[in-house]
Every structure is written in structure tokens, then in C-alpha cells.
Amino acid sequence: MDQVEATSTRRKGLWTTLAITTVSGASAVVIALPETSHADPEVPTPVPPSTATTPHPRRRRIPGQPADNAQAGAPAPAPNGQQRPPRRRRMIPTRAPPPAGAPPNGAPPAAPNGAPPPPVDPNAPPPPPADPNAGRIPNSYVLPAGWVESDASHLDYGSALLSKVTGPPPMPDQPPPVANDTRIVMGRVDQKLYASAEANNAKAAVGLGSDMGEFFMPYPGTRINQDSTPLNGANGSTGSASYYEVKFSDASKPNGQIWTGVIGSANAGNRQRWFVVWLGTSNDPVDKVAAKALAESIQAWTPPPAPPAAPGGPGAPAPGAPGAPAPGAPAAPGVTAPAAPAPAAPGAPAAPGAPAPEPGQAPAVEVSPTPTPTPQQTLSA
């Protein structure tokens, strides 16, 4: 029986050496070649999504804190094993759509028990018309819109001066600003005017307009656009109006305008006439419609009766004295009753020839007319 030596010094065979060399070379070739040199690409397998979070490999978990893979919003465990009260959910209010027929957003809801509006009576009388005398002032004429009364104490003729308002008053207690290129003068036609000699209102208006034009516009020029208009006032009063313009020789002056109206009562026994003179320029023209309405609104103003004297007052007869009539009793036969006070009327203008007054000047002295006026020299149209 042969025994193998533990430390054999026998050389290995040739075939064994070749086999070992071949295996070692094949392994080296396999390791040097890339893995995908002769292989198909590998398709990755999809991984289903997961809500769990993988903890960071280097992050240490602190005792008492929730784990990283805990769901967001989950309540933390109560310390010492105590049960934490349930978390109250927060509800978001939602607005329900308005029901059909509801008022739009922002509109107040109608009162459910509100009374419906009363029906309109088809047989109700129409509202009363506007009072045409609503703007009547104590001088008994209707003031034109946009005009105010001015101080007439400085006028040489007439009893009323109207000015056109151009803006609000500067202070509450001050008069408003007025225009300086237009004005209205009113008064009574009496013996101080040359036109009073004309019984015909149309002729009186033409004559008064000529005199007033020479007075207010004493510059050479030509009269143009002349016309006349009849007037029919209240209480049967009638009259006439005359209008013309003056084209001055000085081209720097705007054309002057003048409207003159004469109107009087129809009572032949106590006839009274008044005049209206409306002055203007081409920059601030005369309103013919308003001028006609102003002249036709003039009425003879009768002042209210004087209050009766108090019994026992100065000048009053003693009660029961002879000859003292009872209150309201007619006068005794043969005794003339005291005459009633004369109605107050606008004053009369003075004669032409005085300088044209301006609103706000000091009172001027009244000038009497000369027997024969000197007409203004104007060119024919």
C-alpha cells in the first residue's frame, strides 16, 4: 500500500499546468469586458408609489418625537401614556346659492309685511299750475331769473335798478358780483320824460328808446336791426316795445343794444304807464323774451290798508264823543270821507343828458329836463 507524502517534491504535470493557465486567462477576460458589451439593455421595473418616508440614514431619532414615517397631521402621542383629546376639525363655511327670485347681492331684502304703494287714482285732479306771480316783489313786477335788485338811490330817473348776477357772493353778508355791461332800469312814465307827451304807447316806446339810447350810448354810430313788439300785460294792460342796436364808428367798441317797453293800464280815468329799459351789448346781449315778460308782469301795486288806530291812542276820538262814527259805519251825510292813500308806483326817470350812472355810486341829484331835447346824431341804417 502506497502512502502519499505530506510534502511532496514531485513536479506537477504539464497538462495540469496548462489547465490552470487557461482558466486564469478566461477569468481575466471576463472581468475586463464590460457587462453590456454583448447583452440587451435591462428594462427597469416600476416601483409603486409609497406614502411612507424612508428615514435618513444619518438622522438620529430623538426620543419623544414622532417617527419620520408617521403621517403628516397625525397627533403626537401624549406624554406619560395619557390620552390626548381628539383634534377638532376646522370647517370651512360654504355659501349656498341664492334661491330663485331673491334680490341680487348688496340689495336690501324687501320687507315681507311691507305695504304696497297706493294705486294712482285715475280720477285725481291734476296738480295746480305754477304760480306766475311767485317771483313778484313789492314793486309789483316779476324779477327775471339771474337778476337781483340793486341800489336805485343814485338814479337820476326811474325807481328800480336790476343787475345781472355773474357769480356767488364773496361772503354770506355781501351782495353777489354783477355785470357792468348790462342793466335794467324801470320807472313810471310821467311829466319828467318827453315820451309822456305821446298818448300812443308805440310812439312813446320809440321816443323813449331814442332818448335813452342817446343818454346811455353817447357815441357816434349807426342804428341797425330795429323792430317793435306789442305788449299785453295782466289786468288788461297793453303797451309796445322798441328795440335797436348801435354799430359804433369806433370798431373797438362792441355793438350797443337797447330794448324799451311802455305799458299802461286800460283805465282811462286813472291811467298809469310804466317803462322798462334793458341795456346790453353784443358781448352780453338783451334777452328779448325775458324783457317782454318783465314788462308784462308790471301791475299797479296797492299798499295794504293802514291798521286802525288803537282806542285811546293819540288822535283817536274818545269813546262816545259826539261826531265819532262807530267802527265800520258809513260817513255821515254831507261829510266827506277821508280819501284813500294813492297807490305807490315806480318813480319817473329824469331828463336825458346826465352822465350814465354806474351801480354802487353815490346818489346823484335829480335833473329836470330842458324844454326841448337835442336828438343824437346817428347815421341812417
UniProtKB/Swiss-Prot annotation:
Domain of life of the source: Bacteria
Subcellular compartments: Secreted
One Gene Ontology cellular component annotation held by this UniProt entry: extracellular region
Start-end of Pro residues biased regions: 95-131, 302-330
Keywords: Secreted, Signal
Low complexity bias: start-end ranges: 63-84
GO molecular-function term, one example from the UniProt record: extracellular matrix binding
InterPro entries the UniProt entry points to: FAP
Pfam families per UniProt: FAP
Signal peptide stretch: 1-32
Stretch list, region Disordered: 35-137, 300-381
Principal location: secreted
Family of this protein: Belongs to the Apa family.
Protein name: Alanine and proline-rich secreted protein Apa
Organism: Mycobacterium avium
Gene name of the encoded protein: apa
